[in-house]
A protein has these predicted regions:
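The feature captures the beta-strand-to-loop junction immediately N-terminal to the Walker
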Residues: 33-35
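ABC ATPase NBD coupling module
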Residues: 65-81, 95, 99, 107
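Helix-to-loop junction immediately C-terminal to a conserved catalytic motif
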Residues: 48
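Conserved catalytic motifs of ABC-family nucleotide-binding domains
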Residues: 159
Length: 226
């Protein structure tokens, strides 16, 4: 379980997060919605270690992951992965998809040799409903839906405990959006993983999430549906 406790974050005199607390239980989808610039992505970046809170803390399975006084525990932080609104930001523009996936596998020691790495690549492609031919493609050669599933594949290879979707479906059509979220549920929830779905769309979070929170104008987070 991931838990955010009383986190605050400001940039200069501009408060972005004000005493934000949020439990993300195992095996659940938690939704956050709110206007652009209200603090949703800032919270996601704190969870991933891109930003540090000014105060408060984030815990993973009851153990401190980051606080206003401690650096991000990057070894344990691998348990939290994020898919961005722009999938191409997660993909090396000069590297073919297959090479990128194998590099990720060897970097994190997920396989002992090329044969095992190739098996893992084929397995994740099948799970993401991607054809093997895209392994020879550069990111710019992928459609928006393919690029988003490729970015998702990179995250799921690491078998995260928490997957954050930061407006990750906002640029997709309704059918592709539904397909992507179905893939996420199938890969994360059965093994006890959790999902944080961040969106400006209240209807999306209401439909897919077990609990829903809203950022108000004071940059506080309040539960609106359980």
């Amino acid at each position: 379980m991931v838990e955010i406790k009383s986190c605050c974050k400001s940039f200069g005199s501009h408060c972005v997060l004000q005493d934000v607390s949020l439990p993300i239980p195992d095996g659940k989808i938690v939704g956050i919605f709110g206007a652009s610039g209200i603090g949703k992505s800032t919270l996601a970046k704190i969870l991933c270690g891109v930003l540090r809170p000014d105060s408060g803390e984030v815990c993973l399975d009851g153990k401190l992951l980051v606080s206003g006084k401690t650096s991000y525990d990057r070894r344990r932080g691998l348990a939290i992965q994020m898919v961005y609104q722009q999938p191409y930001a997660s993909l090396d523009p000069s590297q073919k998809l297959g090479a990128g996936l194998r590099e990720l596998i060897f970097y994190h020691r997920l396989a002992a040799d090329r044969k095992e790495a190739d098996r893992l690549v084929q397995e994740i492609l099948s799970q993401m409903q991607l054809s093997a031919e895209i392994l020879t493609h550069l990111p710019r050669q992928l459609s928006g839906g393919e690029a988003q599933r490729a970015a998702l594949a990179r995250c799921l290879l690491l078998k995260p405990e928490l997957l954050i979707l930061d407006e990750a479906t906002s640029m997709l059509d309704v059918s592709t959006q539904a397909n992507l979220l179905a893939l996420v549920k199938a890969q994360m929830l059965p093994r006890g993983g959790s999902v944080l779905l961040i969106s400006h769309d209240r209807a999306l979070t209401d439909f897919y999430c077990d609990s829903v929170y809203e950022f108000d104008e004071e940059h506080r987070l309040k539960e609106v549906r359980r």
